[in-house]
Amino acid sequence: MIPRQEFGRTGYQSTRVIFGSWALSKATKAEADRTLALLQEYGVNHIDTAPMYGNSEKAIGSWLAKHRSDFFVATKTRRRSRKEALDNLKLSLERLHVDYIDLWQLHGLTNDAGWEKVMGPGGALEAFVEARDKGLVRFLGVTGHGNKVPEMHKRSLERFDFDTVLLPYNYLLMQNPHYATAFNELVGLCRKRNVAVQTIKSIARRPWGSRPKTCNTYFYEPLVTQDAIDKSVHWALGLPDSFVITAGDIQLLPKVLDAANRFEKRTSDEEMRAMVHEFDMQEIFHHAAHARLRDKGPHTWGGQVSKALKELIREGFFEYPKRRALEHVIKALESRGLLTEGKEANISNALAGRVRKGFLKKSKTSNGWVYWIE
């Protein structure tokens, strides 16, 4: 069975591996049932989900109707105002068929504007405290993607006494001196306060680039061989007092659980360096945060636009109730130095792609199409 340890200050004995239910975002009911049954085989007792993860909350809700006492359930919200966050929580409670959620997390709290809104008057933090006081949630946390997240989480902990944090952690990412320093400072603070540290991206190989997406891992191309997954998961589990959230693909889940089940000691840095070379591993956030994308010609422009839009989505640019028209998107990309010029057809096509994949919503107004995150 996968080992367990106390989940921060919550008093809960959680498996060191947490099921990341993005894997269920496109799953059928039969696939979801098989996946959740697999968790029980390995003794996994902790699920991380979110209302923006496609079918995930509904699939888990059907399962929790019979197995609620077997799992610690965490969900998230990307809403930044008190009212919208509470509405989002109500939706999650209904979908999950539960009276309360164990851990509610502010998702993607990694940009300054969103952070100020959440922490300010009428912000989502008020909803979090209110929901906890009413018994709708038990514990509160923050999550994020990208190179900036350790610093932002530290800032959040300095403002409010959150119970958990969630952020990327893998061997290659920790070779970035700036990220490693900020990450270690955050972990040190979390240990002092007994804040649970959850990590993601343990089996990330490299950005997808122009390669076909053969797995349901949105941000990155994953490692897929059992040996490579073993080494990566064992390296991540080598961080004491931390928890690893599984990758977002149900086909990879058995391999990740098998690796965690056999964990004894951390993979050596020498072995990890060899694997980086063997699999041509690359930092997955090298275009995010402070990167400035440039127009390098017609063959690369579309990819750059797509990556730039992903950054805006991560930063909360499209958060409801903001409905962004094409002209606003172009201006945002240009003003941040992400693009040197706007090419409307390419950007419009990239937006349409995000809509098809369910990451953005769109509707037509008198001034044209507008886009937002529901």
Regions from the language model: what does each represent?
Residues 1-71, 127:
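N-terminal binding-site loop/beta-alpha segment at the start of enzyme catalytic domains
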Residues 4, 109-293:
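Beta/alpha (TIM)-barrel catalytic core signal, keyed to glycine-rich beta->alpha loops juxtaposed to Asp/Glu
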Residues 7, 19, 47, 60, ...:
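Conserved, mostly hydrophobic/aromatic
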Residues 56-66, 85-97, 115-124, 148-160:
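Distinct, well-ordered alpha-helical segments
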Residues 300-323, 352-356:
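Positively charged, polyanion-binding regions of nucleic-acid-associated proteins
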Residues 320-334:
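Short acidic, hydrophobic short linear motifs in intrinsically disordered regions
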Residues 355-365:
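A short, conserved structural fragment
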Residues 365-374:
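Short, cationic-aromatic polyanion-contact patches
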